[in-house]
Amino acid sequence: MRVIASSIRKGNVIEQDGKLYVVLTAENIHPGKGTPVSQIEMRRISDGVKISERYKTTDQVERATIEDHNFTFLYEDADGFHFMNAENYDQVQVPKDVVGNVAPYLQENMVVKLSLHEMVPVAITLPQRVTLEVVETEPVTKGQTASSSYKPAMLSNGVRTGVPPHVAVGTRIVVMTEDGSYVERAKD
């Protein structure tokens, strides 16, 4: 489907020169003089190479047809990550470069959204929040509860984040999958 460059957004998949690209950032720039342009940074799906393109906002760009489906995460092995479609029980293998930096947040039986182009996974979307356990942090110090500063902590998935001073080892917390930031104590 052909669309104008100014309508491209993060997460769209573009077809260019016979290859698919996932849009990482898309910014419309309106200089004081000259023609407005769309600055688009994207990653080639086939090999992970990042490129940056600049289009006039009125240029036509080919946006690929993408289908989103819910899949359940099963396991990870040397070949990649394995998911199952809950509707028809088909299993699909997703390469590590498609999963990218969200891999530590994948948990067994987690439902994720996979974006498919001609039945090939091109992008993954995790739930916004995930519950993890603190496995390493500084001990709780009395009298620090009113402080707004965070202390470093290691989570059960191996990711480091900042947590409030009252959080101790063994506490289950909710973090954002986008950036790993602390949200709240888990309510379970």
From Swiss-Prot:
Q: Output the PROSITE patterns linked to this UniProt entry.
A: EFP
A biological process term (GO) from this entry: peptide biosynthetic process
Instruction: Extract the Pfam families matched here.
Output: EFP (PF01132), EFP_N (PF08207), Elong-fact-P_C (PF09285)
Any idea which GO molecular function terms this record carries? Answer: translation elongation factor activity
Q: Where are the transmembrane segments?
A: none
Name the InterPro entries on file: Elong-fact-P_C, NA-bd_OB-fold, Rib_uL2_dom2, Transl_elong_fac_P/YeiP, Transl_elong_KOW-like, Transl_elong_P/YeiP_cen, Transl_elong_P/YeiP_CS, Transl_elongation_fac_P
> What keywords tag this UniProt record?
Cytoplasm, Elongation factor, Protein biosynthesis
Q: Name one GO cellular component term.
A: cytoplasm
Q: In which pathway does it act?
A: Protein biosynthesis; polypeptide chain elongation
Source domain of life? Bacteria
Q: What is its main location?
A: cytoplasm
Q: Does the keyword rRNA-binding apply?
A: no
Q: Does the keyword Cytoplasm apply?
A: yes
The protein's location, in the record's own words, is: Cytoplasm
SMART domains from the xrefs? EFP (SM01185), Elong-fact-P_C (SM00841)
- Give the family this protein belongs to, as stated in its UniProt record: Belongs to the elongation factor P family.
Q: Which HAMAP family match?
A: EF_P
Q: What does this protein do?
A: Involved in peptide bond synthesis. Stimulates efficient translation and peptide-bond synthesis on native or reconstituted 70S ribosomes in vitro. Probably functions indirectly by altering the affinity of the ribosome for aminoacyl-tRNA, thus increasing their reactivity as acceptors for peptidyl transferase.
Instruction: Please state what the protein is called.
Output: Elongation factor P
Lineage from the top down?
A: Bacteria, Pseudomonadati, Pseudomonadota, Alphaproteobacteria, Hyphomicrobiales
Q: Which gene encodes it?
A: efp
